Each structure stands twice: as structure tokens, then as C-alpha cells.
Amino acid sequence: MLNQMKTYPRSAYAKVGGIVYFARMLDKIRLHSAHRLPADYHQNLGKAFDGRCSRFLRVDYSALCERVLQGGTDEEILEWCFVTGRRPNEEEILVWNSFMRKRGWRDEEDGTTKELENYKAQSGLSHRQDLLTLFDYYEVDEGRKE
């Protein structure tokens, strides 16, 4: 269910350096450190999409957390990722963004579609046939979209 009193990370659609999800991951790290991240987000810290994003940039998630907590802008932290890990090219970013924005849609082979359906059911959103991806689900569940 929607809870406007919770503090949520930014939209997964938000981009830093043209890369979706990165801003959300940084927000989750910061909110967790400040004890403001909702408890149901804790189990996936450094896993799931966080893990995918850190692997895409080839940085260790725990090292990234340390860097985020040292301070700096999202852009500075992304540049640290590029230096520490790798700097994806324009085509790799396009593939990443397209892949991430569509997670949950027709992803039966790895269980992501079922996971999305479970999240929707837990949030009372099973009736929402327009929520085809996890990104779309986050938008509604976190109150950015109706």
C-alpha cells in the first residue's frame, strides 16, 4: 500500500550520466545510513538491481557505499565508479537502460515477472495491468504516480 510518510529513494527512471537506476541506488545507500530507508528495502541492499548496477560499472558494492558516505555529488560518485571500475560506452548505456526499464516484462525465465506480480499483490496492486515493469511498480508503490 502507498504510504506517503515513508522516505523513498528517487525514481529508478532518474538518470545520472545517462544511466538509469544509479541515482536510486545512491539514495538507498544514503537513506540507509541515515536510518530513513524503509525496512522492506533492506533485504535487497547490494543485491538485485543494486548488484546489477554495481556489476555493470564493475565496482564493489561495499566500496561504493564507503565512497557515497564520504560525500560528493552523484556525478562525482559516478566518475569515481568510472575510474575505479569501468566507463561504459554510449551503446552499453543504451543496452543497460533498455534492459533495466523493461525488467519484469516477459521475464518469466528468471522469475522476475512472478516477483513483480508478488510485489503488486503485497501492495494491493494486482488489478493494475498497466504496471508491466518493476520501474513502473516503484512509481506507483512509492506514490510518484497514480
Named regions from a protein language model:
Residues 2-41, 99-146:
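Polar/charged low-complexity regulatory segments
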Residues 57-61, 89, 104, 124:
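Short alpha-helix boundary/capping elements
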Residues 38-82:
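Amphipathic alpha-helical packing elements
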Residues 19-22, 61, 74-75, 93:
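Alpha-helix initiation and N-capping motif
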Residues 74-87, 94-98:
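Charged interaction scaffolds used for protein-protein
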Residues 52, 94-96, 115-116:
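Aromatic-residue detector
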